[in-house]
Amino acid sequence: MSETTLPDYLTVATELQSASLAVNPAEMHGLLTGMLSGGLNLADKSWQPLIFDYTNEGMGWPDRALTLAEATLKVTTSEITGSGMELSMLLPDEDASASLFDLADGVSDWINHFISGLGLVGAQLNKASDGTKEALADLEEMAKLGIDEDDDMEEQAQLLEHVIEHVKACALTIHAEFGARPSEDAAPTIH
């Protein structure tokens, strides 16, 4: 069985930019992951009007950009609802010639849009458990973090990796409380 992975950051960035969409790949993925973690219905395309409204003034996305978003959503759904407790993040990387500053900005963009995604699907965060409220508070704080150019870059890179792992843990915690689970008979019946 081959492992499905997120689309390439640079490919997604190029497509979103050429479609003149007001979102970068990290923001798109954070938004989709937040929507999933907030209880997005897994069986329909209810996410599309939400993302169209949020990123493109209600207008649909061009087919290629929408296909990349669907592929991203499919991989993320598989990861976040699976038993592996894994979550990949679509962030700037070496292939996109990203600096440590770009990566930190991407993490912040991802977190802010994750939180927006929770709101778009109407997650009842005020009724969340203490653990979930703590995870959300941690995310809000991590979204404010930045890289200090006067500090040791290698140390900052290691710290950022720890932050990324904590972001993933927080997102999984929130999904565990609010996210939809695929049903056993998720495949539609064909008559």
UniProtKB/Swiss-Prot annotation:
<dbReference type="InterPro" id="IPR036255">
    <property type="entry name" value="YgfB-like_sf"/>
</dbReference>
<dbReference type="Pfam" id="PF03695">
    <property type="entry name" value="UPF0149"/>
</dbReference>
<protein>
    <recommendedName>
        <fullName>UPF0149 protein VS_2635</fullName>
    </recommendedName>
</protein>
<comment type="similarity">
    <text>Belongs to the UPF0149 family.</text>
</comment>
<dbReference type="InterPro" id="IPR011978">
    <property type="entry name" value="YgfB-like"/>
</dbReference>
<dbReference type="GO" id="GO:0005829">
    <property type="term" value="C:cytosol"/>
</dbReference>
